[in-house]
From Swiss-Prot:
This is Syntaxin-5. PANTHER family: SYNTAXIN, SYNTAXIN-5. Keywords: Coiled coil, ER-Golgi transport, Golgi apparatus, Membrane, Transmembrane, Transmembrane helix, Transport. Residues 10-22 have a biased composition (Low complexity). Residues 68-77 have a biased composition (Polar residues).
Amino acid sequence: MQTRRRLHQTDQQDYSSSSTYTIQEDQQGGAGAGSVGTGTAGGSVGLLAQSLVPPPTGHEAAIHIGDNYQSGDSISTPDYSDDKYGKAARQWNLRAFSGHALRTLSAAAAVVTGNQPGINNDSQSNYSYPASIPTSSQFYQSKEEPQETEPEPEIFVMAARDRTGEFANAIRSLQARNITRAVNIRDPRKAKQVQSYSEFMMVARFIGKNIASTYAKLEKLTMLAKKKSLFDDRPQEIQELTYIIKGDLNALNQQIARLQDISKDQRRHTNGKHLVSHSSNMVLALQSKLASMSTDFKQILEVRTENLKQQKTRRDQFSQGPGPLAAHTVSPSTAKQGSLLLSEENQAVSIDMGSSDTTPLLSTQTQMAIYDDSDNYVQQRAETMQNIESTIVELGGIFQQLAHMVKEQEEIVERIDTNVADAELNIEAAHGEILKYFQSVSKNRWLMIKIFGVLIFFFLFFVVFMS
């Protein structure tokens, strides 16, 4: 029993010394060798290397636990197979080995999954390891492979364009279609009326635009026709403008006739008086504008004819005078009678015409050339005047058509006049009635004051005496 107690005490001392020895080795070894027992793991590589060392068993464990062991000492190896202290030592070694193995496996799993936490060493500095460490072949392969860059998106820039007018026209057309469809669903007769009215307004608007453009051309022709200078005369441009304006007037006359036909159709299919009167008034206004424009055009053509006549008289005056050679010929006697300083120059410049028989020939040739030019000019002016006369005749035909249209609308105009006269009479009668009522009210004012005074008197009487 005593020997067993001694052995138990020595075993406890050996166990405490071995545990402190292993802790000191862990502190000296650092992160490279790893820790055994209760020390923290220095790194996953050290743990893996340490896990490969088999744990001491049996006799080796007893030798490793002894602290006072030296190389020369002889230690008796007792049998711990049945001793409870030997079993405790083996269990402790097995527990330490299993703890190291579990920590090693957890570190390896963290390395594989990429969730390895930072490892605390003796200097208490945190280290973070990558989730996966590439090999050398993978590293060089990643360098050799070119990196695929995503293509930059192409930016398409569209030119700006103002299409507000087109948008407004599209909306108007859609609105007109919707109105027509709605009216078609409800009443086909009203749909026809709306369609005819829209057609009438479209034609009237087109005629108004054409009249405005023709007025602009007429103003330009007026500016050109009123010029009286011979050098700033542009007959070709005037003729072109005259021809264009004449065609525009004919086209406008035809368009107004079409508009009048549309208004007649409206009268047949429409019972409303206001719509009929509106359409007839618009036709009459457009006809009056066309008539005034035709009158202005006729006056401009008359002004142009007057200017042409004046230019012709001026040209005739200058062409009937002495010829240019006759006016500028200098006889040798007059040259000699001139200045003595210019005598040499006159002698050098003067040309001897030879005999006097050649001078009449030259004068007749120049006169014939002048006459030919004047004849061409007169022919051009005659053609211009003929064109003007034909245009005036066509304008007379347009006036006749306008007069016929006005004659057709005479009844409507008379109705408008009678309605205006009736309205004026009614307004005058209403004014007279209002004056009569005002006079009657002004006469009865004193009566109203008397009645009001009597009421106040009775009120005061009852209030004073009844109270």
